[in-house]
Swiss-Prot record:
Purpose of the protein: Phosphorylase is an important allosteric enzyme in carbohydrate metabolism. Enzymes from different sources differ in their regulatory mechanisms and in their natural substrates. However, all known phosphorylases share catalytic and structural properties.
GO cellular component: cytoplasm
Protein name: Maltodextrin phosphorylase
Keywords from the UniProt entry: Allosteric enzyme, Carbohydrate metabolism, Glycosyltransferase, Pyridoxal phosphate, Transferase
Entry EC number(s): 2.4.1.1
Similarity remark: Belongs to the glycogen phosphorylase family.
Organism of derivation: Streptococcus pneumoniae serotype 4 (strain ATCC BAA-334 / TIGR4)
Keyword Cytoplasm (UniProt): no
């Protein structure tokens, strides 16, 4: 392999020192693509196809250089020429192929599949503009297309192409590959992204609006196009079928190339269905097998023995149910297969709760996945128990052997080595680098002799990361923050169940408290980051309230020195990699029973933040690992919450009437906030809290405030706080996605 200087000289006829950062980025892009192109693709008879609507892969340059073992050499070579790799990386645009935890998990998983040397590819779509780019203006979220596809990028066009049949036309796909290089491995996998050459951005008008009926020109423009109308729902079905038909044809082709006669397809392929978006892969595989002469019974049997389903949510709205008439309109050739699958279920089981097509003519995608797959997994211990005992109990009673738990994980290459190099290098220095491959070795930190030195170093690393975040926000958003304040951070997509609104009510509490003369021991900066779906009005209202409070506080000289609220614009993986290493208080405050797992909680823990959370998702497992004295838990537990829903016993108006709560909620429509905001939005959200509050914000609010105040007080005992930090970092090894993927392989995939 050429040195970087030789590569740059050949490309530009210049030295590194003579190149601009833009030229160096393109050189490094092609340098790392060349290095990964020289690695052979993983082989092995059986392969996992991880099909997902989202892959939130983040910027790839540094991640790939780390995995290829080139990072340190490249950094030194650039520095010797007076260049900074971090500044070069600024040129890179983040791929907009995902949005939330689902997509980030998929990205961590394909990284770990490659790192463990397993034969497995990600399969998805190549969205040209992703979800959207978030712009914060007039204290509201505005949306514009998130253009990330420049002329030179990480995609490699493949020669593969497939015909995808719809009711009235057939579309021809193009396959692009992104190499997935595992950490220090000799081989690689790929992320296979299907696209359409006919997609045309000129049809986008006014923000992210476009003609939803012009499928040939709109199909891969956006992730999760607005489905609040009929055309939007149909477009989602077009997208999902395009993804799974291409994926299914790829699976069959690759199996045949390796010697399969298709009767033995399950020996060659396993399909992991990541949430319900790829569910149509089941009838599509059956269709393709029967079209090749395999009889229906055998085709169903083959598909059942090669598909596995991961459930990521118990929210009814997220368990997709498509009207059969919509499927008839888009993919009529799948409808007879789905009807036959449903007929077989109804012939065997009389319980209407388990049917695929319900009495309203809606097709339940998760039900099809469970009946016609061989594995169903939840993504945290609590979540899996809720599936078995509550949400999917009817299915667990039928198929107990199918259900298993796979607690989510994160890749430590991205979230420690890349995001927090100072902490990573320090851990290497005192523990060795064994944790790079065996994350449990972080536990050695607990028994490290000189705790005082470790604490001093952790303090200085955290202070450095806070200054780094402050510079980043000043540069990118024009926001000045106090790096000597406590950093309290909540970053995740905007949803009522994640309860950003509860944190906003805490902000109001703290504002009023400071106004009353109760000055905190040190300043506090509360960060929010996340996007709200354009059709999700209440989520947009929550963003509006947060931004209004930010303005009210900034304009109040009695409060501004002590409290600041920052909404990070266009939150993404890049922003997360600045925020997470700088965090003191990690906000994981979903309503108990509603967050399947969460992975932000794991990233914060690994980087030395302490968790403020409910007993929900993976918070439960964090609490078990670190002990109750090293995590801050508040709120009702999942059993209580499930019981309140079952009995319709929660009345937000009763909680609103409480002395500690009413002034906070009323402040939403106070003159001070109304002066900064939109009356309609603020009044709508105020009424929502008092009259509905479906995710029980007011139920947990007083306990949340109490525990957060305790946390702020505890922060002042730096010695005791850092003891807790050390325990959290030490115990984070369990949450490596390498562990998760090893368990998927052992229990579900059975790859060599």
């Amino acid at each position: 392999m050429l040195s970087l200087q030789e590569f740059v000289q050949n490309r530009y006829n210049k030295t590194i020192a003579e190149c601009s950062n833009e030229e160096l980025y393109l050189a490094l892009l092609n340098y790392s693509k060349l290095a990964s192109s020289q690695k052979p693709v993983n082989t092995g008879k059986k392969k996992v196809y991880y099909i997902s609507a989202e892959f939130l892969i983040g910027k790839l340059l540094s991640n790939n250089l780390i995995n290829l073992g080139l990072y340190d050499d490249v950094k030194k070579e650039l520095a010797a020429a007076g260049k900074d790799l971090i500044e070069v990386e600024e040129v890179e645009l983040e791929p907009s192929l995902g949005n939330g935890g689902l997509g980030r998990l998929a990205a961590c998983f394909i990284d770990s599949i490659a790192t463990l040397g397993l034969n497995g590819d990600g399969v998805g779509l190549n969205y040209h503009f992703g979800l959207f780019q978030q712009v914060l203006k007039n204290n509201q979220q505005e949306t514009i297309p998130n253009a990330w596809l420049t002329e030179q990028n990480w995609l490699v066009r493949s020669s593969r192409s497939y015909q995808v049949p719809f009711a009235d036309f057939t579309l021809t796909s193009t396959l692009y590959d992104i190499d997935v290089t595992g950490y220090e491995t000799a081989t690689k996998n790929r992320l296979r992204l299907f696209d359409l050459d006919s997609v045309d951005s000129s049809i986008i008008k006014d923000g992210i609006n476009f003609d939803k009926t012009d499928i040939a020109r709109n199909l891969t423009l956006f992730l999760y196009p607005d489905d609040s109308d009929r055309q939007g729902e149909l477009l989602r079905i077009f997208q999902q079928y395009f993804m799974v038909s291409n994926g299914a044809q790829l699976i069959i082709d690759e199996a045949i190339e390796k010697g399969s006669n298709l009767h033995d397809l399950a020996d060659y392929a396993v399909v992991q269905i990541n949430d319900t978006h790829p569910s149509m892969v089941i009838p599509e595989l059956i269709r393709l097998l029967t079209a090749r002469g395999i009889d229906l019974d055998e085709a169903i049997s083959i598909v059942r023995s090669m598909t596995a389903y991961t459930n990521h949510t118990i929210l009814a709205e997220a368990l997709e149910k498509w009207p059969l008439e919509f499927l008839q309109e888009v993919v009529p050739h799948l409808v007879p297969i789905i009807e036959e699958l449903d007929r077989r279920v109804k012939a065997e089981y009389k319980d209407p709760a388990v049917q695929i097509i319900d009495e309203s003519g809606r097709v339940h995608m998760a039900h099809m996945d469970i009946h016609y797959g061989y594995s169903v997994n939840g993504v945290a211990a609590l979540h899996t128990e809720i599936l078995k005992n509550s949400e999917l109990k009817a299915f667990y009673d039928l198929y107990p052997e199918k259900f298993n738990n796979k607690t989510n994980g994160i890749t430590f290459r991205r979230w420690l080595m890349h995001a927090n190099p100072r902490l990573s290098h320090y851990l290497d220095e005192i523990l060795g680098d064994g944790w790079h491959h065996e994350a449990d070795e972080l536990e050695k930190l607990l028994s490290y002799e000189d705790k005082a030195v470790v604490k001093e170093k952790l303090e200085s690393i955290k202070a450095h990361n806070k200054r780094k975040l402050a510079r980043h926000l000043k540069e990118h958003q024009g926001v000045e923050i106090n790096p000597n304040s406590i950093f309290d951070i909540q970053i995740k997509r905007l949803h009522e169940y994640k309860r950003q609104q509860m944190n906003a009510l805490y902000v109001i509490h703290k504002y009023l408290d400071i106004k009353a003369g109760n000055i905190p021991a040190r300043p506090i900066t509360i960060f929010f980051g996340g996007k709200a779906a354009p059709a999700y009005t209440i989520a947009q209202d929550i963003i509006h309230l947060i931004l209004c409070m930010s303005e009210v506080i900034a304009n109040d000289p009695a409060v501004a020195p002590h409290l600041q609220v920052v909404m990070v614009e266009n939150y993404n993986v890049t922003a997360a990699s600045f925020l997470i290493p700088a965090c003191d208080i990690s906000e994981q405050i979903s309503l108990a029973s509603k967050e399947a797992s969460g992975t932000g909680n794991m990233k914060f823990m690994l980087n030395g933040a302490l968790t403020l959370g409910t007993m929900d998702g993976a918070n439960v497992e964090i609490a078990e690992l670190v002990g109750e004295e090293n995590i801050y838990i508040f709120g009702e537990d999942s059993e209580t919450v499930i019981d309140l829903y079952a009995k319709a016993a929660y009345k937000s108006s009763e909680f609103y009437a409480r002395e500690a709560i009413k002034p906070l909620v009323d402040f939403i429509v106070s003159d001070a906030v109304l002066a900064a905001g939109n009356k309609e939005r603020l009044e709508r959200f105020y009424n929502e809290l008092i009259n509905k509050d479906w995710f029980m914000t007011l139920l947990d609010l007083e306990d949340y405030i109490k525990v957060k105040e305790q946390m702020l007080a505890d922060y002042e005992d730096r010695d005791a706080w850092l003891d807790k930090v050390i325990v959290n970092i030490s115990k984070a090894g369990f949450f490596s996605s390498d562990r998760t993927i090893a368990q998927y392989n052992e229990d579900i995939w059975h790859l060599n």
